[in-house]
Amino acid sequence: MDEETGGVGKDSRFPSGMTTRKATAKATASAKATANAKISAKAGAPVELTVLQTLHQRIAGCKQCPRLREYGENIGRVKRRAYIDQEYWAKPVPGFGDENARIQIVGLAPGAHGANRTGRPFTGDGAGNFMYPVLHELGLANHGNAVSRDDGLKLKHTWIGSVVRCAPPGDKPTPAEVRNCAAHFAAESAALSKVKVVVALGKIAWDGFLAHMLNAGVIERRSAYTFRHGAEYRLPNGIWLVGSYHPSLRNTNTGRLNKVMFAKVFVRARELAGLR
């Protein structure tokens, strides 16, 4: 739903209760095991995987939500006429960007014919066509043309992910599906240890992020943090939360969100992250 409008333990930024803690611990242990087992990348030797790369293999193979997997796979078989000759990713979509990111962008879920097709957040749809050129203009991306995983796009100081990793029917995941995905979001976010600013695209992403903070004991109540475009709050753990309208075609075509408004959010995010 790239088109939608809308660490573990006490010191972690993004856990969501015991279920998430256990899942995150499992993911971390798996990553450490992989790191310990590999040898240096000499000629003919396996390439070293980072913690995030190992986690992303787990995310792409997740089958906790049969309804979402079935929907994404079916979309990949039926396809949209414009993409009839393309092979769809049609599985959970990992995050993307700079592993040393200081800015973390949070969306809701992959678009059925966007990230569910290309396998990368906000890639191959109208929202990405609006967002990536702005990131490029602000020095957060090496170019602004996001069409596929092999288009050479690289982010700088920035990471993009979502609170749900599979494309949901009608752009509406169930509460249980959101909870199932919380462990992936927590583990991925915990690995992004240098993040200073979280930019939530739309109220649903905003609420999803705050739910993690509430379950982690970082905040006492979500109602203290009201969503609006340009809203910013410094959370008790030192992370800045910044809000933006989602760059959906619904918002950009109606003028609710324009590039000047969107760019201002990321200019401010850069400042809060210490990127002058």
Predicted regions and their residues:
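A polyanion-binding, active-site-adjacent surface
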Residues: 47-276
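Intrinsic disorder/low-complexity segments
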Residues: 1-50
